[in-house]
Amino acid sequence: MSLLDRTLLEIFPQDSDSRDAAKARLDNLVMPHWALGDLMDLAIDLAGMQRTIKPLVDKRAIVTMAGDHGVAAEGVSKFPAEVTVQMVHAIIGGSAGVNALARSAGADVFVVDMGVNADLRDLVEQKKLINKKVGLGTGNIAKGPAMSRAMAVRAVEGGIDVAFALSTKYNIIGTGEMGIGNTTPSAAIAAVCTGKTVEEITGRGSGLNDAELQTKIDIIKKSIEINKPNSKDGLDILAKVGGFEIGGIAGLIIGCAAKKIPVVVDGYISTAGALIAAKIEPFVRDYLIFAHRSVEPGHVHMQEFLGCKRPLLDLNFRLGEGTGAAMAMNLVDGAKAILTDMSTFDEIAVTAPEK
């Protein structure tokens, strides 16, 4: 049995007893009923995920999956493909956006080479980079599949490996990514999974003008038409129109769900990874916390498909890397604090309101 198959056997829905116990406590906290709104709903989710009314979210990690894309050759990004490896060095050096925001959230940042088109063995040997490389960038989805099905499995299992390794030290993990051109495969994944049109799903990514946006839309339509991904098969979608880092994110989510670890999902590309994970195993949805809503127009459709009513933040983010996940972690900490640190009316002898 493969690592993926074994891991899927370990994924279960949230624990209903823990959810009920958390709700009973929250219903009686010293404040007007449900006065802290969505954070209280999140507190119930944390209890259900970790199977306790005293969840822990103090040991935090952001995992930035990196990979290159053959479709970048079609001009779907304002940035050249070599920026992927340059940004990998920046994140490892601690100077990127995700580093700044992760420090503010008390989170450690890990960078994973899923498929960067460069030899990064020196960074791996220095233990600055986690090596799960599947290939030197994907195929050009405008001309053929991104990867073979076997490579898709390797990408997902690479993410599972990372989740399992981090599960011994961390109790909450955020997703992130780096890969020039990766909003294009993400849009293709979103269109296939949600059934929305490519026009509804596709945005300007790194800042495309109107003509460039139309070219991007045409390329995504072409990639779906040529590759014909099976909308019911997550691995087929990943293989046909996905990316190595997107597969890594899917695997990270699957691995965290198996270990009962909450996953803070970052932006558009991370949510594409969540779509793949949910196609492979729908129960992973029970372990997702949606950090924010991206400027990318398709993000709302992707989140709604995954059952997200409203993400924690809506700040016009469109960077990725794990920046939104880092920003949201303090809100997750607040949700946990409401459940574990506030008193009930009975505990401090405060008169409860009339029912």
UniProtKB/Swiss-Prot annotation:
Keywords: Cobalamin biosynthesis, Glycosyltransferase, Transferase. InterPro entries: Nict_dMeBzImd_PRibTrfase (IPR003200), Nict_dMeBzImd_PRibTrfase_bact (IPR017846), Nict_dMeBzImd_PRibTrfase_N (IPR023195), Nict_dMeBzImd_PRibTrfase_sf (IPR036087). It catalyses: 5,6-dimethylbenzimidazole + nicotinate beta-D-ribonucleotide = alpha-ribazole 5'-phosphate + nicotinate + H(+). The active site is at E321. The keyword Transmembrane helix does not apply. Pathway: Nucleoside biosynthesis; alpha-ribazole biosynthesis; alpha-ribazole from 5,6-dimethylbenzimidazole: step 1/2. Signal peptide: none annotated. GO terms for biological process: cobalamin biosynthetic process. The keyword Cell wall biogenesis/degradation does not apply. SUPFAM superfamilies: Nicotinate mononucleotide:5,6-dimethylbenzimidazole phosphoribosyltransferase (CobT) (SSF52733). GO terms for molecular function: nicotinate-nucleotide-dimethylbenzimidazole phosphoribosyltransferase activity. Coiled coil: none annotated. It comes from the Bacteria. Its EC number is 2.4.2.21. Catalyzes the synthesis of alpha-ribazole-5'-phosphate from nicotinate mononucleotide (NAMN) and 5,6-dimethylbenzimidazole (DMB). Belongs to the CobT family. This is Nicotinate-nucleotide--dimethylbenzimidazole phosphoribosyltransferase. The gene is cobT.
